[in-house]
């Protein structure tokens, strides 16, 4: 709603009110924001959203004296799926894994695809009491076969875990530490 004072031809002052419907503009803005923070393939949140949300969770943990955790997952030998079956089946697998992760209680809105075959899960302070259960639920997802191209395929993952604010309160440092822990798990035999 806009109001502007105008002068009529006879010199008298009047107010002119203009009303604009901005519904379409707001819907467009919301769609742009969603595209900026969402991975186009899996529908999970992306790296940019992860960094923003992780900063908020770290602040919350520090304010409340709570703890949270960052889990960095990398699919083991995913290249074999892509090369052996084709990228379209790799995409199907990534979507299936994303869907399964989002169904785990306590992390429904804190799963992120960092790119390629790497995922981050943030366990916020309010879900930290379920930390052990969440890790076990993730492991269960990867203990079962995935049905691709008329056959069952196993896909394991390696996981690096750091807690916050114990391991630090810098988003960049926490992601880097979890990534390093994940590569250590890969070096010691994968599927860990």
Give the residues covered by each predicted segment.
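Short loop/turn elements at sensory-signaling interfaces that couple input to output
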Residues: 2-15, 27, 170
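Sensory beta-strand/linker motifs that couple input domains to effectors
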Residues: 18, 71
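Hydrophobic scaffolding residues in well-structured cytosolic catalytic/regulatory domains
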Residues: 32, 50-57, 101, 119
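Conserved nucleotide-binding and Mg2+-coordinating catalytic segments in signaling enzymes
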Residues: 33-53, 64, 73-87, 95
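Hydrophobic framework residues that shape the active-site pocket
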Residues: 65, 78, 96-97, 111, ...
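Catalytic-core segments of nucleotide cyclases and related cyclic-nucleotide turnover enzymes
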Residues: 87, 132, 136, 149-151, ...
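Active-site-proximal alpha-helical element of nucleotidyl cyclase-like catalytic domains
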Residues: 89-108
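A short pre-motif secondary-structure segment
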Residues: 109-113, 153
